[in-house]
């Protein structure tokens, strides 16, 4: 019974002592302990096992028990001490609270005493300073009254003097007096309710109005709208009148400026009327010469009359530009058919020179916001084409590949007058664009004629495989056009010029590059695509001559240069054109065209070497391999293949020295074409004896070594072949070697032969297996059981369609080739 009660007590105690993880974590942080007994996950069994790890340790059990009892006794003592200490805690707390409350009450009493004393002190200070404050207010009011009376006296006297001086046109004295009167009047704004003050204010406004009308009348008299200018220099009266106008309503100043400029340019409107000979573009110099003379005349006669901050000379020049732009636009619309490109460029050049003259002479401070927005200069460009204006001498000295790669010059400062007149020519720049279209068309025709007359680059010279000189000439001309057009406009005309550039880049690619690629022909006539793919039995394969190989390489190098330069051209055009039009600059199509030329050139080189090797592969498949009695040196067909490789590859490599990556592409494409074709012809070697298979294996190894050495064959400098190329050759030719090793293996026992086939050929399938059985000369009846065994032992492919697809791509069958040939022939006939 006692034991049950003890168990219940222990369970209740454990339930009470079961703490939440948060509480347990807080206890561990406040009272860190390394004692296992303090851990929340304490396990009594593990603790006992730690104390007594072995049976021998049980000998010390009494000592351990005594230590634990001693520890329990100490804990009990500590607990009793703590419990006793908590007996009087409640009473002590109540006593401390009462003491705190008493202290707070005493503090409140002291604060109240301090507040009462402060209020008494404040009242005492107010009583002492009451009389002093009244005296201070009286002094302030008296000072204000005296100041106001003085201002009133000054205002009344100033108004009287202002009216008298206005009548006598004493503008020099009026300028100083008026400003003072205006300043004094500002002090009386809050007194405008007083009739006398309001009356003085109205007299000042009336005097200002009278002054404005009087000054305008004086200027009208001195510079009448009709008739000639007043002889002699300006009077001091008008100079002082301008100082007064600076103080008056800004509209007075604007009216004076407007009338003076209008009178100053009246002669210009008469001299250069639309019906006058000097108004046309061929005499545009006279317009600018006239305004330059007028500016000199203004500085001599009227430079001191107007205040410097009015910038009258610049205002005259700006108004002249606006009038000239309007007049030129009007006359060009009327006589649009008479505008020729030389005349247009002449007028634009003279106009831009004049705008540059204005930028050097004036700051552009008088240009209004609207004018600046309308005539906003194009964004600064870092295009190296802007370093100077090209001349014929410079074009002759221009390097072939340096035109678009010159270092950038520092950005030139903006011209605030750019386009202020030349903007009127932009609607007529189509004449310039059409002229460039015609010139580029003639340039392309000249390139075609020169190529026919001079022929392709000669082999065994520095020219072999070099970039065609016509390519550099084309981009030099493009540079000239770009610089010229960017000086004329950076808006829509630049987009139109870009379209012209695109047109003739495509024409150059078609007429000069693609159009001059050699055609593959035979002695009997044209060579069709099928004849390139089919085997040549008894017919001589037409190879490209040395000159033709050099020409193909030269066209490839030229296309590569055009591709890189066109990409740079696109970047420079985007730098030149307005920001809003950048999205419309896109030469991707032209770059793709040059990429197509490069691919076509490489394909021609591959087809030529591939076709040259076809007769040798055909000879290999026609040999009687079952009659070979001993293994000797490499077979004649291997020697023939190696001979063709040694003839073509060094020529191609030397001519593509400047475009190494495309030579690597040629090697890769040839390997991808030759190796599957070699394996296809290998399957045609049937039946084959053991010795014949050994000879074929030797030949295959020889071809493998030659192909691995193909990038540097015949070269004095031995370079390691690119890893991508080596991987293709090793993978393809190793497959051919594995096929021959399977052929050489005995076909009995069947299980061993099938397992050996699966092991050696990772891309094994029943189709390849049957071809190997045909090479061994086995009968169909023998093959059926072996094929069935193979199907049973073949692992299931992850995707049958993908597996078979990849195998068919790697080793196309003759049936697949003939089917492909027929489709291509039908497509060609349909196109023709």
From Swiss-Prot:
Acts as a component of the GARP complex that is involved in retrograde transport from early and late endosomes to the trans-Golgi network (TGN). The GARP complex is required for the maintenance of the cycling of mannose 6-phosphate receptors between the TGN and endosomes, this cycling is necessary for proper lysosomal sorting of acid hydrolases such as CTSD. Acts as a component of the EARP complex that is involved in endocytic recycling. The EARP complex associates with Rab4-positive endosomes and promotes recycling of internalized transferrin receptor (TFRC) to the plasma membrane. Belongs to the VPS53 family. PANTHER family: VACUOLAR PROTEIN SORTING-ASSOCIATED PROTEIN 53 HOMOLOG, VACUOLAR SORTING PROTEIN 53. Keywords: Acetylation, Coiled coil, Endosome, Golgi apparatus, Membrane, Phosphoprotein, Protein transport, Transport. The modification Phosphothreonine is found at residue 391. The modification Phosphoserine is found at residues 377, 580. It comes from Pongo abelii. It comes from the Eukaryota. One of its GO terms (cellular component) is endosome membrane. Pfam families: VPS53_C, Vps53_N. One of its GO terms (biological process) is endocytic recycling. Residues 799-809 have a biased composition (Low complexity). Residues 386-397 have a biased composition (Acidic residues). Residues 97-138 form a coiled coil. It is found in: Golgi apparatus, trans-Golgi network membrane; Endosome membrane; Recycling endosome. The modification N6-acetyllysine is found at residues 110, 360. InterPro entries: Vps53 (IPR039766), Vps53_C (IPR031745), Vps53_C_sf (IPR038260), Vps53_N (IPR007234). It is a peripheral membrane protein. The gene is VPS53. Its main location: Golgi. Component of the Golgi-associated retrograde protein (GARP) complex, also called VFT (VPS fifty-three) complex, composed of VPS51, VPS52, VPS53 and VPS54. Component of the endosome-associated retrograde protein (EARP) complex, composed of VPS51, VPS52, VPS53 and VPS50/Syndetin. EIPR1 interacts with both EARP and GARP complexes and mediates the recruitment of the GARP complex to the trans-Golgi network. Interacts with VPS50 in an EIPR1-independent manner. The keyword Membrane applies. This is Vacuolar protein sorting-associated protein 53 homolog. The keyword Membrane applies. Residues 373-412, 794-822 are annotated as: Disordered. Residues 398-412 have a biased composition (Basic and acidic residues).
């Amino acid at each position: 019974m006692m034991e049950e009660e003890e168990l219940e007590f222990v369970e209740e105690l454990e339930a009470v002592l079961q703490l939440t993880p948060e509480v347990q974590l807080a206890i561990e942080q406040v009272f860190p302990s390394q004692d296992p007994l303090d851990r929340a996950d304490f396990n009594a069994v593990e603790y006992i096992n730690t104390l007594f790890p072995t049976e021998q340790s049980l000998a010390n059990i009494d000592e351990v028990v005594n230590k634990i009892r001693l520890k329990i006794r100490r804990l009990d003592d500590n607990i009793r001490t703590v419990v006793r200490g908590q007996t009087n805690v409640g009473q002590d707390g109540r006593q401390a609270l009462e003491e705190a409350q008493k202290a707070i009450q005493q503090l409140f009493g002291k604060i109240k005493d301090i507040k009462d004393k402060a209020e008494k002190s404040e009242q005492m200070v107010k009583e002492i300073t009451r009389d002093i404050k009244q005296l201070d207010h009286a002094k302030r009011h008296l000072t204000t009254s005296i100041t106001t009376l003085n201002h009133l006296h000054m205002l009344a006297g100033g108004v009287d003097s202002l009216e008298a001086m206005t009548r006598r046109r004493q503008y020099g004295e009026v300028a100083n007096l008026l400003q003072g009167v205006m300043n004094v009047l500002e002090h009386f704004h809050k007194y405008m309710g007083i009739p006398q003050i309001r009356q003085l204010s109205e007299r000042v406004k009336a005097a200002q109005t009278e002054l404005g009308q009087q000054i305008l009348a004086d200027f009208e008299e001195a510079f009448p709208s009709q008739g000639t200018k007043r002889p002699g220099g300006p009077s001091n009266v008008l100079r002082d009148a301008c100082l007064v106008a600076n103080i008056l309503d800004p509209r007075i100043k604007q009216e004076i400026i407007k009338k003076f400029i209008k009178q100053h340019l009246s002669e210009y409107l008469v001299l250069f009327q639309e019906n006058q000979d000097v108004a046309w573009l061929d005499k545009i110099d006279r317009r600018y010469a006239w305004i330059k003379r007028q500016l000199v005349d203004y500085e001599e006669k009227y430079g001191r009359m107007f205040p410097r901050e009015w910038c009258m000379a610049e205002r005259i020049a700006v108004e002249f530009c606006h009038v000239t732009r309007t007049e030129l636009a009007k006359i060009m619309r009327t006589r649009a058919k008479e505008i020729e490109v030389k005349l247009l460029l002449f007028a634009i050049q003279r106009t831009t020179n004049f705008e540059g003259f204005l930028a050097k002479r004036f700051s552009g401070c008088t240009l209004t916001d609207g004018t600046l927005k309308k005539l906003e200069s194009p964004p600064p460009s870092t295009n190296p084409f802007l370093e100077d204006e090209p001349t014929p001498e410079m074009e002759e000295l221009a390097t072939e590949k340096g035109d678009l790669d010159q270092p950038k010059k520092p950005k030139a400062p903006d011209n605030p007058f750019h386009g202020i007149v030349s903007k009127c020519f932009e609607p007529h720049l189509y004449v310039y664009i059409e002229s460039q279209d015609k010139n580029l068309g003639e340039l392309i025709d000249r390139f075609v004629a020169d190529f026919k007359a001079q022929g392709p680059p000669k082999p065994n010279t520095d020219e072999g495989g070099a970039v065609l000189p016509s390519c550099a000439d084309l981009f030099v001309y493009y540079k000239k056009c770009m610089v010229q057009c960017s000086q004329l406009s950076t808006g829509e005309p630049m987009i139109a010029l870009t379209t012209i550039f695109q047109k003739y880049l495509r024409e150059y690619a078609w007429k000069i590059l693609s159009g001059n690629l050699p055609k593959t022909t035979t002695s009997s006539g044209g060579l069709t695509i099928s004849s390139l793919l089919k085997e040549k039995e008894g017919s001589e394969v037409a190879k490209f001559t040395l000159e033709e190989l050099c020409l193909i390489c030269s066209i490839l190098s030229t296309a590569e240069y055009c591709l890189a330069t066109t990409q740079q051209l696109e970047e420079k055009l985007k730098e030149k054109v307005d920001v809003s039009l950048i999205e419309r600059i896109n030469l991707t199509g032209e770059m793709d065209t040059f990429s197509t030329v490069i691919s076509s050139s490489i394909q021609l080189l591959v087809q030529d070497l591939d076709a040259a090797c076809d007769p040798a592969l055909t000879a290999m498949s026609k040999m009687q391999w079952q009659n070979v009695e001993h293994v000797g040196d490499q077979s004649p067909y291997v020697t023939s293949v190696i001979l063709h490789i040694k003839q073509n590859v060094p020529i191609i490599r030397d001519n593509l020295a400047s475009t190494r990556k495309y030579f690597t592409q040629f090697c890769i494409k040839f390997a991808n074409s030759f190796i599957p074709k070699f394996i296809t012809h290998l399957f045609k070697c049937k039946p084959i004896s053991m010795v014949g298979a050994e000879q074929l294996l030797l030949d295959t190894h020889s071809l493998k070594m030659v192909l691995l050495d193909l990038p540097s064959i015949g070269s004095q400098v031995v370079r390691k072949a690119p890893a991508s190329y080596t991987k293709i050759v090793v993978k393809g030719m190793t497959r051919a070697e594995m096929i021959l090793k399977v052929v050489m293996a005995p076909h009995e026992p069947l299980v061993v032969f099938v397992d050996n086939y699966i092991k050696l050929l990772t891309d094994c399938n029943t189709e390849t297996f049957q071809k190997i059985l045909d090479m061994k000369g086995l009968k169909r009846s023998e093959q059926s059981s072996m094929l069935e065994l193979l199907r049973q032992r073949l692992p299931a492919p992850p995707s049958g369609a993908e597996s078979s697809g990849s195998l068919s791509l790697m080793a196309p069958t003759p049936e697949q080739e003939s089917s492909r040939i027929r489709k291509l022939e039908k497509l060609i006939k349909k196109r023709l």
